[in-house]
């Protein structure tokens, strides 16, 4: 196999990669020594990935020496455990070292197996690589792309156009797709829900700080759902719906957006509506949770077991049957006529 830098992984390193992919290790530190990729540190998992993150990674980062770190998450995809690939390139390292490690990154990912790598993190200072830095990276990834100068000018024009008092009948521009950051505790709760260690997560918007925060993770049955819906505030709910359908036992993730009508302020209604799509984008495309059904309600009383079942498994509408042509009155049909085809008529005449 040829590479840009000629750096390759030895057979020992490839064997270690295989053991790591099978879940034996939480962390591998990789360095380039004598023009070969080598494993210079490894750690086995002892607790959750969040609890071990900073204590395992940060002590391995040297001030003047680049390295790679493969860090294993607790989540899995179709190929196995998911990993974070970290490229550490400190500001004070030699330029030649920086270039060498930058040019070898693609090789490392390919040798390890790109399908196992969920996220890539690059850092020049430890704050970039810390757990807090990782969450900042995820928040940035889920935020909208920066606006061009023309788009920013257009945005300012629209803001000025809509800076008017909003009355009952006033038409106004609504906010579109606001991606508020998700706090750490909320993100962790969603991961636990995906792994089915929780069956209910409720999130709310901290309007003052403009963040999405955790509100509740109480273990919840279907019959308890109406009690979880506030009557005076909006919420986002994620529920692991365990049920049977056509003889199969199913686990389905359901998203419920509750908005109790006009008991909420205009700003609250606008923010919850605008943050919903970016939040679901993070859930479905970052956490890879498949949402079976998205429901909007204004009253928790709607969430009966039958309602939830029919939302997740909507009834198929039967095709309309054509009305049969009505028969004529009995005894008044007249003489039955026999209509012959052309061939039959000729035979009869012969």
UniProtKB/Swiss-Prot annotation:
Alphabetical keyword list: Actin-binding, Cytoplasm, Cytoskeleton, Repeat
Superkingdom of origin: Eukaryota
InterPro entries reported in the protein's UniProt record: ADF-H, ADF-H/Gelsolin-like_dom_sf, Twinfilin
Subcellular locations according to the entry: Cytoplasm, Cytoskeleton
TM regions (residue ranges): none
Coiled-coil regions listed in the entry: none
Alphabetized SUPFAM superfamilies for the sequence: Actin depolymerizing proteins
Matches recorded under Pfam families: Cofilin_ADF
GO MF annotation list: actin binding
GO CC aspect terms: cytoplasm; cytoskeleton
Main localization category: cytoplasm
Region (Disordered): 316-350
Any GO BP: negative regulation of actin filament polymerization
Domain ADF-H positions: 4-139, 177-313
CDD domains linked: ADF_Twf-C_like, ADF_Twf-N_like
Summary of subunit composition and partner proteins: Interacts with G-actin; ADP-actin form.
PANTHER family, alphabetized: TWINFILIN, TWINFILIN-1
Family (UniProt): Belongs to the actin-binding proteins ADF family. Twinfilin subfamily.
Its job: Actin-binding protein involved in motile and morphological processes. Inhibits actin polymerization, likely by sequestering G-actin.
Protein name listed in UniProt: Twinfilin-1
Lineage, opening ranks: Eukaryota, Metazoa, Chordata, Craniata, Vertebrata
């Amino acid at each position: 196999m040829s590479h840009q830098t000629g750096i390759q992984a030895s057979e020992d390193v490839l064997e270690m990669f295989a053991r790591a992919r099978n879940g034996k290790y939480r962390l591998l530190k990789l360095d380039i020594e004598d023009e070969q990729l080598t494993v210079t540190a490894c750690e086995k998992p002892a607790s959750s990935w969040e609890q071990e993150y900073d204590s395992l990674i940060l002590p391995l980062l040297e001030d003047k020496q680049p390295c790679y770190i493969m860090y294993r998450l607790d989540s899995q995809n179709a190929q196995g455990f998911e990993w974070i690939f970290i490229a550490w390139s400190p500001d004070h390292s030699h330029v030649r070292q920086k270039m060498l490690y930058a040019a070898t990154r693609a090789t490392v990912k390919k040798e390890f197996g790109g399908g196992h790598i969920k996220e890539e993190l690059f850092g020049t200072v430890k704050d970039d690589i810390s757990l807090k830095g990782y969450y900042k990276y995820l928040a940035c990834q889920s935020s909208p792309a920066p606006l061009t100068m023309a788009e920013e000018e257009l945005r300012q024009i629209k803001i000025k156009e809509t800076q008017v008092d909003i009355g009952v009948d006033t038409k106004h521009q609504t906010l579109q797709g606001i991606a508020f950051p998700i706090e750490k505790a909320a993100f962790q709760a969603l991961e636990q829900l995906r792994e089915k260690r929780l069956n209910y997560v409720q999130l709310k918007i901290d309007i003052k700080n403009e963040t999405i925060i955790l509100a509740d993770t109480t273990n919840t049955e279907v019959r308890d759902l109406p009690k979880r819906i506030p009557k005076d505030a909006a919420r986002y709910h994620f529920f692991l719906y365990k049920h049977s359908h056509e003889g199969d036992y199913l686990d389905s993730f359901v998203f419920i957006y509750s908005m109790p009508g006009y008991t909420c302020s205009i700003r609250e209604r606008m923010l919850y509506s605008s943050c919903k799509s970016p939040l679901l984008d993070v859930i479905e495309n970052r956490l890879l949770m498949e949402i079976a059904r998205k429901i909007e309600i204004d009253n928790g009383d709607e969430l009966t077991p039958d309602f939830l079942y029919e939302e997740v498994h909507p009834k198929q509408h039967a095709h309309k049957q054509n009305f049969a042509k009505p028969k004529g009155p009995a005894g008044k049909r007249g003489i039955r006529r026999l209509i012959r085809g052309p061939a039959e008529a000729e035979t009869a005449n012969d």
